[in-house]
Amino acid sequence: VPSGSMKPPILPGDRIVVDKLAYDLAVPFTWVRIFRWGEPKRGDVVTFDNPQDERLFVKRVIGVPGDVVELRRNRLFINGDKASYEPLGPDEIAELPIPNASSHRFFRESVLGDSRVIMVNRRATGTYSTFPPQEIPAGYYLMLGDNRDNSSDSRRIGLITRDRIMGRAHAVAFSVDLDKYYLPRLARFFTDLP
């Protein structure tokens, strides 16, 4: 993973395990699906081809077909339900593998039975921190990074079609610290993604 857009659960330098059979069977190196047996669910961490430049991205599914999703100053609303935001305590923040954590705020975001830890920049007002209610059409998904103020996601690249979704990420296989000469981060080896 080259960027910090999915911090805190996925860090730059993580090598993640992706189940490419989570939703369907595809012809290798194509978007041709042979058989489909599942659909991405709200809260799944998935990999997909960016429609703008074909790079592989990893983000969290926030909106599924039929959902009405809105973001107001980094506050999420899905189908009219406002997400709750519980600030993480100092002990919880200390356990996160985030350097310079003091420049961010960390919250446990919960909506419609799904929960995750997100981070927002203390100083950012962000032009992408708000978007009006948007109904997700059939065959499309809305993706957001957990690092809300530092993620190139559906707010910038648009909704993602189902056929572009490659699989569901579920673990970190191994991790290296890109800022420390690729030293291994042993504590992250073989850890599950929340």
Regions found by a protein language model. Give the residues of each.
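Aromatic-capped interface at the extracytoplasmic side
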Residues: 1-6
